[in-house]
Every structure is written in structure tokens, then in C-alpha cells.
């Protein structure tokens, strides 16, 4: 019943509403208002998602800076060890400039104060201390007997702090100072042995050297390296080893070996070749008319061979090689330095021919000395006035015309040769075989 009542109560309002509508059909049925749409709630803006804060990148830990490796300290460059001075340098250091210049001069004994041609007297002994010459040249006028000559050469050397050269001009035959006075060796001029070959040339060189040493000489102005290529030549002729350039070259080289075996220094002469001339340089100017190229192919062959065999000195002839220089060869830088030293490679001592010869009559001793040394000469043979020659060289050094280095070069060559001289003499006195 209860359920029925509830149902009736619910239907009554519906009935009433239906009746009212049927009784007033014309009445405007008021518009049933559209039910107001429940306004949609304003959309709540979706909040932008709060961006996750970008995490600050965890900074890479700053690496500790790798310490720069401590550089190894740059070692100071090891200085090149200062070379020990050579024996000749030690000798040179003890010499004043003037004493060095005297080493570049060869005297005749008569040039000394109170000069005596046969024995050293007291005045000469004192003068040797004031003028310590590089050497002495003895000629036939200094030779009277074997005992006298031995004493003379011994006493000339005895007063010298640096042993002097004791030189002779001993070729055999035409130029035979010892053989024509006190010696026992009688050789003919070398040309006569040319067809007996190199062994004979070597033997003759050794024989000459041994006789020279017997009388106190330590250097010879031989062998002759000129070639007798001009039949009209009057000054060389039979003194030459040959009239053929190649043969002369072989014989001269063998002779150099012979001189050394006998214990004596030797000298090639007369550079650049006196065998194709006609005049005699003892009396005046002598001209060589060959070109330099012709000299290389001819006259220079024996000089080249002798140098390669170890010759100690080369003598510059009083010759004018007009294709190269209008002055005598000893004043020619082109001949002495460029040709002889640089082209032929000669490292020994360059010596002049005797400065008293007629070919140099128009030059003073001072001029000759300075011009020759500037050209490359080391040793002045027998100037007429040795004191004037040394004075001129000293003045040229003080004025800067000659450098002290240039003088030093020559003196070192001379001292080196003297040390070699001692070695040769020792070897000859005590042959290994």
C-alpha cells in the first residue's frame, strides 16, 4: 500500500499539467526555455608543465693541470777542448816579433859582426845573440879542411837558442862545393845518370846527404827540378836530371827520397822552371815565355812530383813569367801563393834564390824582403844587407802592410821544418834496418 501511495503522489503533478494544456489550445505555449546549458566550466588552463629544471650539468671536475714537465736544464755546450799547442807553436810563443823576422833570413857568415869566413870568433858569437838568423849558407870560401869545416858548422849552431839551418849548394858535378874542396864524394852532374833510372837518382841523393851531414850541414839546395828542354840554355844544362819532363819528374821524386834517407832537408829549384830559358839570372833578368797552361804540362811536372815525394823547400827562381806577371816570380802572389801553394798544394817552406844575384839589382834589400813575403815567400836567402831586410819587414808589420799573422805563418813553417830536420837526422843516424 505504501508503495501505491508513493506512486500516486508522483503521478498527480503529471496529470494536472496535462489538463491545463488541453484547455487552452490557442494559448501560446510559452517557449519552453532551453534549459540553460550549464556553462562549461572555464577550462582550467592546463598548467604548462613546470619544466623539470634542467639540471645544471655537473661540471666535469676541472682536471688538475698537468704540471709542465720541468725541462731538463739545457746543458751548456761542452766547449771544444783547446788543442794543445804544437811544438812549433811553443817555440814561436817565446819569440819577439823581431826574433821571428830573423828566423826568416839566411845569412852568410861574413854578414855577422867581425865576420870570418872560416871560424866563429868572439864578435860573431855575440852577434849571433842579437841576430838569431834562421840559417847560414856556406860556400866554397868557407871550406878549407874537413876539421875546420866541422868546427865551423858546429860553432855556428852552438850559440843559437833555435838550431839554425846550415845550408850548402851541393848538386854533384858542376855545382859541387864539398866535392871540389874538402869532400871525398865525386859525383858527376845528374844529367849523366838519367838513363840509370830512379834507383840511381835515389842513391845519389842519399850519398850527397850523407856527405853533407858528415860536415855538419842539415839542408841542401838541391835537387834541380828544372828540365833541360832548351838546348841553348847555358845555366842549367847538365845540372838537370833529364831533358824529358816525365823522366825528370820520376828522377827528382826519387832524389827527394834519397836526401831524406841520408838525413838532410832538400830543396826543389828553380820554380817555376829555368830550363827553357837562355839568359842567366846570376847576371840579369830572365824571361819565361811559356803560357801558364804550357808550364802545367811541362816545367811543373818535376816540381809536382817532388812535392808529392815530400820535398821540404821550393826555391823561387829569379824569373819573370810574362804570361802571369811582369815582376820577378818571387814578388808574384799568383805564382808563389796561387800556383805553388794552392794549385800544387805545397805546404813547406818557400825560399828565394840568393838575393845578391844580378837579376834583382834594381831593388833594395828592404823592398825585396817586403814584396817577397807579401807574395808568400818564407825564407830570404843571403840578402846583401840582412839588417835592412829585417828593419823593412818590422816597419811593414808596424804599419799594417804585413800582418803579424802572415809573419807567423812563415815562421811556423820554418820551425816545423827544423823539427822535421831533427827527426830526419835521428832516423839517418839510427836506421831501422
Task: Provide a role label for each language-model segment.
Residues 1-8:
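Bacterial N-terminal signal peptides that target proteins for export
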Residues 17-21:
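C-terminal motif of bacterial Sec signal peptides marking the signal peptidase cleavage site
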Residues 22-35, 39-43, 48, 80, ...:
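Preference for extracellular/luminal or secreted protein segments
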Residues 90, 151-158, 207-210, 246-258, ...:
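Alpha-helical scaffolding segments of alpha/beta enzyme cores, especially the outer helices
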Residues 98, 165, 263-266, 345-355:
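Short beta-strand/loop segments at the ligand-binding rim of alpha/beta enzyme cores
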Residues 110-114, 125-248, 270, 275-289, ...:
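Enzymes and membrane/adaptor proteins characterized by extended Gly/Ser/Thr/Asp/Glu-rich
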Residues 251-268, 294, 298-311:
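Phosphate/pyrophosphate-binding betaalpha-module
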Amino acid at each position: 500500500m505504501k508503495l501505491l501511495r508513493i506512486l500516486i503522489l508522483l503521478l498527480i503533478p503529471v496529470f494536472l499539467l496535462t489538463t491545463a494544456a488541453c484547455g487552452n489550445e490557442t494559448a501560446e505555449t510559452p517557449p519552453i526555455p532551453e534549459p540553460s546549458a550549464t556553462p562549461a566550466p572555464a577550462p582550467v588552463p592546463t598548467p604548462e608543465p613546470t619544466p623539470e629544471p634542467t639540471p645544471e650539468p655537473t661540471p666535469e671536475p676541472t682536471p688538475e693541470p698537468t704540471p709542465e714537465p720541468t725541462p731538463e736544464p739545457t746543458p751548456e755546450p761542452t766547449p771544444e777542448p783547446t788543442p794543445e799547442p804544437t811544438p812549433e807553436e811553443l817555440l814561436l810563443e817565446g819569440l819577439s816579433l823581431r826574433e821571428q823576422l830573423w828566423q826568416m833570413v839566411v845569412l852568410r857568415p861574413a854578414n855577422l859582426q867581425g865576420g870570418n869566413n872560416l871560424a866563429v870568433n868572439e864578435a860573431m858569437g855575440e852577434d849571433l845573440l842579437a841576430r838569431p838568423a834562421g840559417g847560414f849558407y856556406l860556400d866554397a870560401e868557407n871550406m878549407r879542411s874537413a876539421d875546420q869545416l866541422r868546427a865551423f858548422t858546429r860553432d855556428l849552431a852552438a850559440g843559437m837558442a833555435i838550431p839554425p839551418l846550415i845550408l850548402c849548394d851541393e848538386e854533384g858535378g858542376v855545382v859541387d862545393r864539398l866535392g871540389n874542396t874538402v869532400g871525398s864524394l865525386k859525383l858527376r852532374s845528374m844529367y849523366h845518370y838519367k838513363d840509370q833510372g830512379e834507383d840511381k837518382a835515389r842513391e845519389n841523393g842519399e850519398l850527397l846527404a850523407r856527405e853533407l851531414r858528415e860536415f855538419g850541414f842539415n839542408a841542401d839546395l838541391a835537387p834541380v827540378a828544372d828540365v833541360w828542354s832548351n838546348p841553348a840554355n847555358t845555366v842549367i844544362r847538365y845540372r838537370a836530371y833529364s831533358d824529358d819532363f816525365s823522366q825528370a819528374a820520376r828522377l827528382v821524386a826519387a832524389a827527394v827520397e834519397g836526401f831524406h834517407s841520408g838525413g838532410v832537408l832538400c830543396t826543389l829549384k828553380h820554380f817555376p822552371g829555368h830550363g827553357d830559358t837562355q839568359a842567366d839570372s846570376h847576371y840579369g833578368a830572365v824571361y819565361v815565355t811559356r803560357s801558364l797552361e804550357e808550364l802545367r804540362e811541362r816545367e811543373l811536372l818535376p816540381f809536382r812530383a817532388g812535392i808529392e815525394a815530400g820535398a821540404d823547400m821550393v826555391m823561387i827562381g829569379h824569373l819573370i813569367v810574362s804570361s802571369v806577371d811582369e815582376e820577378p816570380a818571387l814578388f808574384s802572389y799568383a805564382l808563389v801563393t796561387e800556383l805553388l801553394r794552392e794549385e800544387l798544394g805545397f805546404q813547406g817552406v818557400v825560399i828565394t834564390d840568393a838575393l845578391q844575384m844580378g837579376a834583382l839589382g834594381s831593388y833594395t834589400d828592404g823592398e825585396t824582403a817586403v814584396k817577397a813575403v807579401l807574395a808568400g815567400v818564407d825564407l830570404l836567402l843571403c840578402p846583401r844587407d840582412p839588417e835592412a831586410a829585417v828593419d823593412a819587414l818590422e816597419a811593414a808589420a808596424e804599419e799594417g802592410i804585413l800582418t803579424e799573422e802572415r809573419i807567423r805563418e812563415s815562421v811556423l813553417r820554418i820551425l816545423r821544418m827544423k823539427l822535421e830536420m831533427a827527426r830526419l837526422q835521428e832516423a839517418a843516424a839510427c836506421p831501422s834496418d
